[in-house]
Amino acid sequence: MYAATLPPDPDNAALLYYQAFLLRPDPDAETSASIDKVIRGGEPDEKLREYLNLSDCRETIEFAEAAAQLPYCNWGIRFSQGLGARLPQLEHFRPLRFLLYADARVLAMDGDYHAALNRCLTIRRIASHVGDDTMLNYVVSTDIDGSALRYIQNILGSMLPDAEILTWLRGQLASVQGAVLSPARVLEMDLELIMQSMRNDPNDLLWLREQLVEDNEGKSAEYFWNMTDEELLALITEPYADFLDYALGVIDSEMPYEEKYVELQRLTDKFKEEFSNIPGTNQLAIAFAPQIIEIYSLQVRYTAQFNALKSAIGIYLVTANTGRLPDTLPDYLPKDPFSGQDFEYEFTEDGFILRCRAKDIYWTSHTLWPPNTPPDVLARSIVYEYEYKIQSNTESN
């Protein structure tokens, strides 16, 4: 007797995401404007609903949802290409997340807030799958997750506080993995990709040997010419690897934000000064060492946004149970990572604001202001605040 046996569905989420990318229909100009309006806070219109009801749109969402539920995701990155490895999938996540959020906004408008928030959680899962295999993956992953947190913030502001949904959401945020917080793996992978790029270019290795022979005063020319390629790479990269170890130790320490930032800056300046004249290592010192502070700052900004959202859910829960905003922050809410203290809590006409108590040192010093910017603007510190809205049947002081 014949018994059909179908092979199982793919267990690699990337295969489903790639199909979602191919299925997603390109919106026309009018629909693109509708999507952009929703992303900027506007309401969904009929043109957007028509687009979302297309069969290819529904299947795109279904494939993305199925992919996001899988634990394993391998994008097929050709790591052997080093820093030249192509990442064509990354450009597709922006329109995909916009599509998912547009659908979430329609669901919220129709009163299905649970499903709307689930769409946003799918975007968080996608951020986790984008991963930290390369520096670009890490940055895109964090950006996607930050968008998901903003989208959740917007959905919460469109609904009446509901204790059941809020309790469920709080649990989901604790269990659903978003972007990888620790920069350790991506920084170590970055170094490995740098080394692989050098391996791939014999002319680059030849130039490095010639420069070391020419510039080194303590070793003979034969010492460098007799080195294997791997020994040469180790000589060039070991100082940077040691620097990474020290820097990651600082990031993982219990030091407060400002002390960590100052120490990372000191380590970076010291490394650049010590190795700026050593061929090969000087390229790492100039091009890659400064990104430690950039990545750490990105991590802290993301943590502030995530902690603010979790704190806001605590406030919404009190509001759902009492019918009014609490006078002060509930106990045991996450802290502002810039200051290590509770967020500042301020009432507004239609909700509340959570504000960090200390500035973002990196962006305060690196913001590029246009010419003729007033001095009082130039003197401002970058301090983040997060505004949350409450629907009108609640009250505040």
Regions found by a protein language model. Name each.
Residues 1-397:
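Short acidic linear motifs
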